[in-house]
A protein has these predicted regions:
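Acidic, small-polar-rich N-terminal luminal/periplasmic segments of exported/outer-membrane proteins
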Residues: 211-345, 349, 677
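Membrane-embedded beta-barrel scaffold of Gram-negative outer-membrane proteins
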Residues: 465-469, 473-479, 483-491, 671-731, ...
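Outer-membrane beta-barrel translocator/receptor signature
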Residues: 310-312, 323-402, 408-412, 458, ...
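Gram-negative outer-membrane beta-barrel transporters
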Residues: 715-801, 837, 857-861
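Acidic/polar loop-and-plug regions of large Gram-negative outer-membrane beta-barrel proteins
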Residues: 384-388, 398-467, 477-514, 557-585, ...
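Structural signature of Gram-negative outer-membrane beta-barrels, strongest in the C-terminal barrel
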Residues: 405-409, 419, 514, 533-535, ...
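C-terminal beta-signal and adjacent terminal beta-strands/loops
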Residues: 792-802, 806, 818-862
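Signal-peptide-cleaved, periplasmic/extracellular N-terminal interaction regions immediately downstream
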Residues: 2, 6-9, 17-202
Length: 862
């Protein structure tokens, strides 16, 4: 394994483009300049006198927020204005490539006043210009791109004391298309530019006319790379600065792959497998051999049914995460990040139809509710009506998610989000992990035709952000989730020796209610100790879950032939049951992100949790358990050259066992520890990112049978998971995007009183890989035509750890074709093109997956 790591590291270093030094031009504070009397050349000279080197270095450490982008029509074309709230200094590097004029602005980010990132795009704003985009190129750089239809557009650069940086873009229809040439500056052309590239020279500003018009905010991100994420640190941290593997599946990948079950997005991440359950409804994802924890916008969530109607991106943090999120398995967590309100209007409608009577419609509306744009909203609504390749499965799902954000002041905002889900679902429990079931038709459902699962959820999320000053801010959030379920579910039972008869089919169900409460408060401070920079996070979390189940259960009379099924057998009911449980978690955590040197960063933190659990049947005295655990994490990142990050980390996790020994003593929580080292790289001018990780996880204190009394448990079991992973995502060349992964994993029982040592963990393949790539034609008559293809390989794996059935490996092949023009898009997605037969599993059951399916989508944006 180490040999493979060294070879992979060598490969990544070899393919990295040589680091290029670029000349940077600083723009002075806006209030110090006079747009009407100074040219760019003159105020560049002024900057050299006013900003000595030490001041410049100080500014470079601060990321300037550009809070708005506007476009004003002019007699030449259009002016694009990047507005800052405090008039801070900005830097610019201009170049041209092909038909594109490109400006990079280091130490700057597009951020709404509430801190959310945003993207701007205008299609065909003027004659001769096909597109203007303003995006966060990476975690510390804004990129402005102006694409010409026939050649490089003519762009001039100004600064305004009242507005910000201004890019004047000339129309090809303008009589003043060719500007008067200005004297060349003495600054050399940045190294690394092609011979045909040139640095655009500034001229006097053009006159403004008419009323300002704002560029349209792009509601959907169109990149495969995301430069930063909050899951790993609870702060917006560049992925390259995190000493743990974290992968982000952005909205564009979800859209290109035609994903309708949001957990399918994790197929693109190394070391993950889907663990289906309850008719492919439960969204359990195995990460590095363990069940993952689930978050929704950073709050603990249940994986039972996850609607993707308002999901912006999916973040997968690998390894233990108890340091910030409390009790969880050591493999990792999945965070579903929802869409936020935007300051400019954006409206989208999606209509999807597919095989097996699949129909889904969705709308996404956002924009301001007030003229001053202090009150913003977003509304996501979707409706799905679908059949299935499995018998007796019909689904009817309504999802509504409104969000409102109010900017109380420059330093305070409040967001109120609500989600409503009503799902009436057919039910499918799959079959037992027995090889005979692998030969039955894929459509066979052992459940009864009248089995059902009804779900109703209400989720309320209130978030407050307050900035005391530039160095201290508060974030506080409260979540309430109400879950109501009712069901009638058939259990498949065991198969007789004849390989075809089920004699012990049973059923269960009944109403279930759960109320979830969660409160998180984080205080984030930035300060220095000498030359060392700190970002300190102090947080408190409290959450409670109350659940009550009123169960019905029984058995079916007679036998069931899986090759000649007969449904409608009489049910013999058992007495009704009642079960209730309450879990209360209180956690306090501290984290410090330390910049020792510009290229050397330390992450250290710890969390202490108190967990109370009680359960009962409403008649006898409840069973109670009290646990506490401390979960530390420490990691370091070293960046020898700008594109490369070398990292190492140690992290830990815990899970309460809620059991007692024969002597009556409670079992200690199971503990997980991980050691991880890796390399992160940003290639092709930061358009492509790669992560190579090697890890070793040990989980201890696992309950296993007491050899002296088999009615009780002792916590001496141990399992291990170790492996190597590679993830790649980004844009190789204009229009050609890729997301790929590969991994080797060895997850096995290392100590147990019941299971043999070396037994593989359930649903943990020894190897897997994925590749999805798309290409969209960038110019010419076919501009907007896109094609995509994907391969998803999963190695063989154990379906059940007690009586192992090996599920065969498979390679699923997908493809897509799309056409995008102006504000509409049409797409066809082909899934499982070669109609292979493959399976997903959880710890107890196996589920056949869909054959070849065709799905078509029409999307319109306004």
């Amino acid at each position: 394994m180490l040999r493979s790591l060294f070879i992979s590291c060598f490969f990544i270093v070899v393919i990295i483009q040589p680091t290029q030094a670029k000349e940077v031009t600083e723009i002075s504070r806006l209030q110090e300049l006079n747009r009407s009397t100074r040219t760019v050349k003159e105020w560049l000279a002024q900057i050299e006198q006013q900003n000595p080197p030490d001041q410049g270095e100080k500014q470079e450490s601060e990321v300037v927020q550009v809070t708005s982008v506007k476009a004003n029509p002019t007699d030449k074309g259009v002016e694009v204005i990047l507005q800052t709230s405090l008039g801070q200094e900005l830097q610019v590097v201009n170049r041209s490539s092909g038909n594109n004029f490109i400006t990079d602005i280091p130490n700057a980010q597009l951020r709404l006043p509430n801190g959310d990132a945003f993207t701007f795009r205008s299609t065909k704003p003027i004659a001769g210009v096909s597109e203007i985009t303003v995006t966060n190129f990476d975690a510390q750089t804004i990129r402005v791109s102006v694409t010409g239809e026939a050649g490089v557009p003519i762009v001039e650069l100004f600064d305004s004391p009242d507005e910000g940086i201004i890019f004047s873009v000339a129309s090809s229809a303008s009589s003043a298309q060719q500007p008067q040439q200005q004297p060349q500056t003495q600054n050399p052309t940045p190294s690394g530019q092609s011979e045909g590239s040139q640095q655009t020279q500034p001229t006097q500003p053009s006159a403004q006319s008419d009323e300002p018009i704002e560029l349209v905010v792009t509601g959907e991100q169109d990149e495969y790379t995301v430069p930063e994420a909050s899951t790993a640190t609870k702060t917006d941290t560049p992925l390259r600065d995190i000493p743990q593997s974290i992968q982000v599946i952005p909205q564009q990948v979800i859209r290109d792959q035609g994903i309708t079950r949001i957990t399918d997005a994790t197929r693109n991440v190394s070391g993950t497998t889907l663990a289906s359950g309850y008719g492919n409804l439960i969204g359990d994802v195995r990460v590095r051999g363990f069940s993952s924890g689930f978050l929704r916008d950073g709050f603990a969530s249940q994986p039972f049914f996850i609607d993707g109607g308002n999901i912006e991106q999916v973040e997968v943090l690998k390894g233990p995460a108890s340091v910030l999120y409390g009790a969880s398995e050591p493999g990792g967590i999945v965070n579903y990040v929802t869409k936020k309100p935007l300051s400019n209007p954006y409206y989208a409608v999606d209509l999807t139809a597919g095989s097996y009577d699949f129909y889904k419609s969705a709308i996404d509306l956002t924009g301001p509710l007030s003229n001053d744009k202090l009150l913003l909203y977003r509304l996501n609504v979707s409706y799905e009506n679908s059949g299935s390749y499995r018998d007796f499965i019909d689904n009817d799902i309504v999802f509504i998610a409104p969000v409102v954000t109010y900017q109380v002041s420059d330093s305070t905002d409040i967001t109120l989000a609500y989600e409503y889900l009503n799902a009436k679902l057919g039910f499918d429990r799959g079959f037992r992990p027995v090889s005979a079931f692998l030969n039955v038709p894929r459509n066979l459902n052992i459940a009864e035709p009248d089995d059902f699962q009804d779900i109703e959820q209400h989720r309320l999320n209130l978030t407050l952000n307050h900035r005391f000053n530039q160095n201290l801010r508060l974030r506080s959030g409260f979540v309430y989730l109400s879950e109501k379920q009712d069901s009638l579910v058939t259990q498949p039972g065991e198969l007789d020796a004849d390989g075809r008869t089920l004699t012990d089919r049973s059923y269960f169900g009944g109403p279930s209610n759960a109320d979830n409460y969660a409160l998180q408060t984080d205080l984030i401070g930035d300060f220095k100790t000498g030359s060392i920079t700190h970002q300190l996070l102090l947080g408190l979390e409290w959450r409670k879950r109350d659940q009550a189940d009123r169960g019905i259960s029984g058995v079916y009379e007679g036998s069931f032939d899986i090759f000649n099924p007969a449904y409608g057998l009489p049910r013999i009911a058992d007495p009704n049951s009642f079960f209730e449980q309450t879990t209360i978690t209180t956690g306090i955590y501290l984290q410090d992100q330390v910049t020792l040197l510009p290229n050397l960063k330390l992450l250290a933190g710890g969390r202490y949790d108190f967990v109370e659990y009680s359960s009962g049947d409403g008649q006898s005295a409840p069973t109670e358990f009290y646990d506490s655990a401390f979960s530390p994490r420490i990691g370091i990142v070293y960046q020898p050259i700008e594109p490369i990050s070398l990292y190492a980390s140690y992290s830990s996790s815990f899970v309460p066992n809620n059991s007692r020994t024969a002597s009556g003593e409670p079992l200690e929580p199971s503990r997980g520890t991980q050691y991880e080292v890796g390399i992160k790289a940003e290639l092709f001018d930061k358009r492509l990112s790669a992560t190579l990780a090697v890890y070793d996880i040990t989980k201890t204190n696992i309950p296993t049978t007491d050899p002296d009394d088999d009615e009780f448990l002792i916590a001496v079991g141990e399992v291990k998971s170790r492996g190597i992973e590679l993830d790649i995502a980004g844009e190789i060349s204009p229009g050609w995007k890729v997301i790929a992964s590969g991994y080797l994993n060895d997850a096995f029982v290392s100590k147990d009183n019941n299971l043999p040592e070396g037994r593989r963990l359930t649903n943990a393949p020894t190897q897997g890989a994925s590749l999805w790539t798309t290409y969209e034609v960038q110019k010419g008559d076919l501009r907007g035509l896109g094609i995509g293809a994907g391969l998803f390989f999963v190695g063989d794996r154990t379906a059940n750890i007690d009586d192992p059935l090996t599920l065969p490996s498979y390679v699923r092949t997908d493809a897509s074709i799309s056409y995008k023009r102006d504000n509409w898009r049409a797409a066809l997605n082909f899934k499982n093109i070669f109609n292979i037969k493959y399976y997903e599993s959880n710890d107890f059951l196996v589920f056949p997956q869909a054959p070849f399916t065709l799905q078509g989508t029409i999307s319109v944006e306004f």
